[in-house]
């Protein structure tokens, strides 16, 4: 029962973003605005201010969060029925690592059990990306060093 309520709340948070659509930065920031209780009708902030707020709240930039979502989908490690708001909960959890009650309040008043479930599913999914992300990084670093020494 609690899971269904949380799912409906996330669907409300993501009313513009389809689960099957590619999550863009605009879709991620719209979900973040809903979590912050800044709906569509509220005053629009400058992009730099909004990115700073996003970094302070979730621990990474908007482009990084969007890229994480895309890589989770591409590598097929996105938790089943996972939504963008769940990813943001996980990022917030890793950034703040606070008491569950406080995190649930910040996440829009969700149930503790639901928050814990989705936050940990996404933390584990992000951790599972380490081998592919780190190996790609090291490969490009190797190529960069190789070509800079040739030139």
Regions found by a protein language model. Give the residues of each.
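Short amphipathic alpha-helical segments enriched in hydrophobics
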Residues: 72-76, 97, 126, 130
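Active-site- or DNA-interface-adjacent structural scaffold in DNA-acting proteins
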Residues: 116-151
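Short, amphipathic alpha-helical "recognition" segments used to contact nucleic acids or chromatin
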Residues: 83-96
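Short, charged amphipathic recognition helices of the HTH superfamily
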Residues: 95-107
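Alpha-helical interaction elements in eukaryotic regulators
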Residues: 61-64, 85, 99, 115-118
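Short amphipathic alpha-helical segments embedded in low-complexity Lys/Glu-rich regions
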Residues: 81-82, 135
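Short, basic interhelical loop/turn and adjoining N-cap
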Residues: 105-118
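Charged, often Cys/His-bearing segments associated with DNA-binding zinc-finger transcription factors
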Residues: 1-78
